[in-house]
């Protein structure tokens, strides 16, 4: 898999890399893998970050195309090349877990934090993967290990606050996150909103969701959460505006939830014509949603 790349062939390598990325974006994962292999075949000599980057893309394309074994092999090749590549261990562990190979996953996760001991995101990612596979206690062990990371920067406080939130220790979460907000962490507003939402304090949840939106860094998930709070209060026009902002974002990760709430908000505001327009779009995108099919029949 690895040999390296000379300067003379770097341009061809980067061209094939670009072709692979474009193929991934269009859903042609087989073509993407072929392009990434062509990029790597240009390599002779010393390995650089470019080759490693291409391998990450290749593994992602293999996974997206349903070739989990191929993706595992690619990550393993990266580990064989650099036995201290914590990120490759983590990703190999995630896929091993999907294959129900929990023993390998646990070893991979242990190596991931061994070589990247100061990466909060890594600990949280491991927790989420383990908890999603009915191993919450094992996941919480990683969350608690993350407290060994020292520091009182805005980033440290934000991550610690989020971890306390995941552990259900809301008082500690608020303390850390309020400290992060004072140090101008926009993300801390989002996590504070989630803490207050978990405590069913909708007033404070709305306050911090709005602060997150006002920071200019909000994502579509935050816009949907803010819309749901507005809907609970009967402010359907405000909810619709939040939903429109969420759908207009560059990276919309929760389109289905946003469209579903948009239909409901239009209905409750009495705008059945707009609700009908959205439900037609929704049913075409998510034909297996039985509730949406019933809504389609109702509005029709």
Indicate where each model-derived feature is located.
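N-terminal leader/linker segments that initiate helical-solenoid repeat arrays
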Residues: 4-60, 64, 73, 80
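Helix-start (N-cap) detector for alpha-helical repeat units in TPR-like alpha-solenoids
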Residues: 13, 47-48, 52-53, 86-87, ...
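Register position in tetratricopeptide repeats
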Residues: 25, 64, 98-99, 129-133, ...
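Canonical positions in the second alpha-helix
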Residues: 39, 77-78, 111-112, 145-146, ...
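Structural marker of alpha-solenoid helical repeat scaffolds
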Residues: 42, 46, 81, 115, ...
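Canonical tetratricopeptide repeat
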Residues: 50-53, 57, 91, 125-128, ...
């Amino acid at each position: 898999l690895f040999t390296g790349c000379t300067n003379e062939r770097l341009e061809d390598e980067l061209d094939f890399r670009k072709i692979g990325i474009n193929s991934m974006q269009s859903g042609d994962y087989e073509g993407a893998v072929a392009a990434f292999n062509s990029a790597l075949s240009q390599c002779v000599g010393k390995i650089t970050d470019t080759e490693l980057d291409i391998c990450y893309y290749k593994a992602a394309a293999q996974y997206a195309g349903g070739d989990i074994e191929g993706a595992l092999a690619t990550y393993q090749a990266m580990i064989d090349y650099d036995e201290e590549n914590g990120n490759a261990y983590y990703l190999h562990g995630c896929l091993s877990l999907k294959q129900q190979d929990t023993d390998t996953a646990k070893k991979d996760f242990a190596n991931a934090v061994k070589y990247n001991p100061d990466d909060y995101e890594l600990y949280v990612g491991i927790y989420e993967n383990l908890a999603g596979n009915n191993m919450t206690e094992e996941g919480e062990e990683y969350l608690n290990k993350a407290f060994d990371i020292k520091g009182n920067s805005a980033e440290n406080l934000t991550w610690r606050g989020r971890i306390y939130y995941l552990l259900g220790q809301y008082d500690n979460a608020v303390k850390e996150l309020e400290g992060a907000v004072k140090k101008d962490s926009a993300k801390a507003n989002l996590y504070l909103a989630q803490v207050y939402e978990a405590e069913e304090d909708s007033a404070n949840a709305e306050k911090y969701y709005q602060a997150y939106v006002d920071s200019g860094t909000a994502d579509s998930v935050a816009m949907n959460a803010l819309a749901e709070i507005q809907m609970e209060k009967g402010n359907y026009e405000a909810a619709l505006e939040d939903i429109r902002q969420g759908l207009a974002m560059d990276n919309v990760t929760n389109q289905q939830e946003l469209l579903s709430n948009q239909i409901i908000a239009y209905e409750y505001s009495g705008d059945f014509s707009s609700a009908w327009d959205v439900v037609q779009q929704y049913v075409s995108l998510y034909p297996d949603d039985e509730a949406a099919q019933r809504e389609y029949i109702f509005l029709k």
